[in-house]
């Protein structure tokens, strides 16, 4: 099993899809990496030689921000928005949709489970 950027890639998958298991690498980026290193998309992860795996590791390390560093960077960007007091930062702080979606009826993913307001008795 190839271990790249701290992630165990699934053995039986093709390398182009296996690399997408790394946070920050999608299919397009995966193909760019394989082109730069000169490895065929059709190759399976278990077929990779140690030299090829090392070449992929080196390419990712030198040119891409992935896994922990990327997560930290995204978290710091969101924290900066909140500290600035920008509209986007306030939406993050309140746990509401950030990109202008309507919230009257939807936005359940961001808002969480419904909180029913009980009827007040006299």
From Swiss-Prot:
One GO-annotated biological process of the protein: translation
UniProt keyword list: Ribonucleoprotein, Ribosomal protein, RNA-binding, rRNA-binding, tRNA-binding
rRNA-binding among keywords: yes
Gene Ontology molecular function terms on file: rRNA binding; structural constituent of ribosome; tRNA binding
Gene3D superfamilies: 1.10.8.50, 30s ribosomal protein s13, domain 2
Family: Belongs to the universal ribosomal protein uS13 family.
Coiled-coil positions: none
PROSITE patterns from the UniProt entry: RIBOSOMAL_S13_1, RIBOSOMAL_S13_2
Entries under NCBIfam families matching the protein: uS13_bact
GO cellular component: cytosol; small ribosomal subunit
Record organism: Campylobacter fetus subsp. fetus (strain 82-40)
Record's protein name: Small ribosomal subunit protein uS13
């Amino acid at each position: 099993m190839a271990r790249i950027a701290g992630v165990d890639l699934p053995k039986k998958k093709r390398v182009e899809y296996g690399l997408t298991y790394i946070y920050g690498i999608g299919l397009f980026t995966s193909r760019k990496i394989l082109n730069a290193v000169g490895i065929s998309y059709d190759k399976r992860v278990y077929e990779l030689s140690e030299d090829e795996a090392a070449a992929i590791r080196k390419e990712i390390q030198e040119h891409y921000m992935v896994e922990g560093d990327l997560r930290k960077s995204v978290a710091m960007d969101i924290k900066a928005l909140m500290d600035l007091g920008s509209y986007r930062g306030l939406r993050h702080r309140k746990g509401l949709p950030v990109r202008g979606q309507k919230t009257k009826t939807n936005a359940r993913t961001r808002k969480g489970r419904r909180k029913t307001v009980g009827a007040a008795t006299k």
